[in-house]
Every structure is written in C-alpha cells, then in structure tokens.
Amino acid sequence: MPLFATPFAQLDLVRQPEQDGEPLQAFDAADEYLLNQLHERGVTAQCRVLVLNDAFGALAASLAPHVQVTSSGDSHLGFLALRKNLARNGLDLGSVRFVPASETAVGPFDHVLVKVPKTLALLEEQLIRLHGQLAPGAQVVAAGMVKHLPRAAGDLLERYIGPMHASLAVKKARLLIAEAAERPQPRSPYPTRYRLEQPPLTLLNHANVFCREGLDIGTRAFLPHLPRSLGALRAADLGCGNGVLGIAYALLNPQAELTLVDESYMAVQSARENWRAALGERPATFRADDGLAGQAAGSLDLVLCNPPFHQQQVVGDFLAWRMFLQARDALAAGGELWIVGNRHLGYHAKLKRLFRGVEQVAANPKFVILKAGK
C-alpha cells in the first residue's frame, strides 16, 4: 500500500477491520485536500484542531505531532483504526483525544476538519454540537469525494456555522469552507422516535442510527419469528442498532441475559435508552465494540443478527462474514445464530461453511430468516 504523504507526515495506514489482500486504501484524496488546505492556512503547536469522522485516523494521526488534536466520530472501528495507525507509525496513543459522537467535544477549537458522513443527520447533529465550541475566527472545512458530496452538506454548514463557499475539485475531491459567524443556539431535531405496534414500543433513535425514521424491513420480517420461552439463556443482539431485536427478545424471554453490541456509539446509546424505557431496571450489557471481538469464547447461547452489508461507501458481505465468525467463536456448543438477510446475499451457503447445521425459519419474497447451530 502507498504511504499517505502530506506536508504534515508520511504515514503507513491500514483500514479496520483489516482484510487479507485488502485492495482499498485507508485514506482518500479528500483527506489529502483537507490537510493541504490546513497547511496553507498555517498552524502552530498551540492550535486546537477538531477532526470529525476520520474513518481510519489519517487526519488525526497526520496532525498529532504538530497541533492539539481531538478526534470525534460515531464508529468504534474508526477509534480502533486510529489507535492502530498511531501505534503503527510510532506515535503516542495519548497524542489524540477521542470523543464518541454520542458526546460533545469540548473546545474551543481553532480549526475543524470534517469528513462528510454518509448519513447527513450525523453531520447535522455534529454541526449543532459545535455551537459554543468554536474560537473567534475559527474555520470549519468539510470534505468529500465529489460523487459522495451532496449539496445539502453545504446548506447545513451555512445554517449552523456561517458563510460557506465550495472549492474547486482536486483529484475528484472538494472542500466546503465555512467561516464561523454568530448563529442563534440551534435546537437539535435528534433523537427521533417512532412507534412500533408489535411489540408495542416507542423507539428512540439518535442521529446516526440506521433507519431512524422507522423500522427497517429486514427487522420487521425477523420480529415475528424470534425464539421465545427459552429460559435463562445468554443472548446477544449483534449490530443492535436501536436495540429493537434484543428488547423484543427480552420481552419474550423474561429470564434471558442480554448483551447489546454495535460499533456505533449512537446506536448503543439509543439501545440503552430504549431498553430502560421498555424494561426498566432489568440488567443488560451495552457495549460499543468490534462486533463480538471482545466476547469470551463459548460465553453465549444465542446470537441475533441483522447484518449490515456496507461500511461507509463500500458495499459487500465482508462485515457479515466477520460477524458470523465472531458469533461462532462466542457461542457455546449447541448455541445458535439467528439472522435475517436479503435472499440474494446467499447467507445460507456461507453459514454452512461455519456451522454444523443451518435451517430456514421463515422467508418472504425479499428476506430469509436462518438459524445456524454450533
């Protein structure tokens, strides 16, 4: 892989999770453009720089030896990538302060560098949280590859930060540059809520939660087929989102011990709040993690999963395959993985390579629900 070379550093960077024969780089031309623009603007060791949505740590790691860096994002995988890439390049792990997107990064900041996320609601919430955290004369610069950079991103910068102009495109990347100006204290439209009829739940969703406006159709297909009356099993909702699968299963299985895990901090926060609203003080474990990587081997009896099929702009089944491997390792002998997936993804064949038996629980023209036994 080529080095990431900018006026600040030359770094050897990897993606997270790493894949054998990985063809994709851990940086893009938008990262390079952001750092070149900041270098031209000029920084000193006293400059306080906030980096938002730094997918694999390219921005924060480049800046760490030169300025005071805070990095904030909603991906725990992104946090792990940052730590890995700092260590890989001989940089102090403490040189970058990390703040999950579920919390507010406290300034004041002189410069804010933003990689525009796929979910514009996340960008909106992040810009709202910048209110009161910018130093006088601060600049907020957002960047993305032109094909992934919606006009609405510039509108959000205008609304919440100040006058904005777009740069020329360089290597198919573009900057949106906003000068901080007086703006009234904004009121966030997040979290959102929607009502579920069965089970009867009102579900809260922070800004970056998948399908925050309503239940996704895969989960809707899965809910009527959740196993019930299984006793005191140790179960996990893997990739829990707002927690609906884990909560619905817990309602059907009052003695079950639940762990809800997601790589999104906002998802875990949503799941925790929804659990409390539905189940009060009933104990459960909530964890932002790289799937079940932190789960002890053989410590679960059941895993429920509606696996994702994309990481940022990259589509594929590599994340689902990784979750299936993690579930197999975390399950005790006789344990089961239950999943829902699009028919065309062929999960049945993949699961057969990992588990002793795979059965179809239910299906409709679009989705299939499978259970795989260890």
From Swiss-Prot:
Protein keywords: Cytoplasm, Methyltransferase, rRNA processing, S-adenosyl-L-methionine, Transferase
EC numbers on record: 2.1.1.174
GO CC terms: cytoplasm
Annotated GO MF terms: 23S rRNA (guanine(1835)-N(2))-methyltransferase activity; nucleic acid binding
Subcellular location: Cytoplasm
Catalytic function, reaction form: guanosine(1835) in 23S rRNA + S-adenosyl-L-methionine = N(2)-methylguanosine(1835) in 23S rRNA + S-adenosyl-L-homocysteine + H(+)
Record keyword S-adenosyl-L-methionine present: yes
InterPro entries reported in the protein's UniProt record: DNA_methylase_N6_adenine_CS, rRNA_m2G-MeTrfase_RlmG, RsmC/RlmG, SAM-dependent_MTases_sf, Small_mtfrase_dom
Pfam families from the UniProt entry: MTS
Root EC class: transferase
PANTHER family attached to this UniProt entry: RIBOSOMAL RNA LARGE SUBUNIT METHYLTRANSFERASE G (PTHR47816:SF5), RIBOSOMAL RNA SMALL SUBUNIT METHYLTRANSFERASE C (PTHR47816)
Physiological role: Specifically methylates the guanine in position 1835 (m2G1835) of 23S rRNA.
HAMAP family: 23SrRNA_methyltr_G (MF_01859)
UniProt protein name: Ribosomal RNA large subunit methyltransferase G
The organism's taxonomic lineage, starting at the top: Bacteria, Pseudomonadati, Pseudomonadota, Gammaproteobacteria, Pseudomonadales
Gene coding for it: rlmG
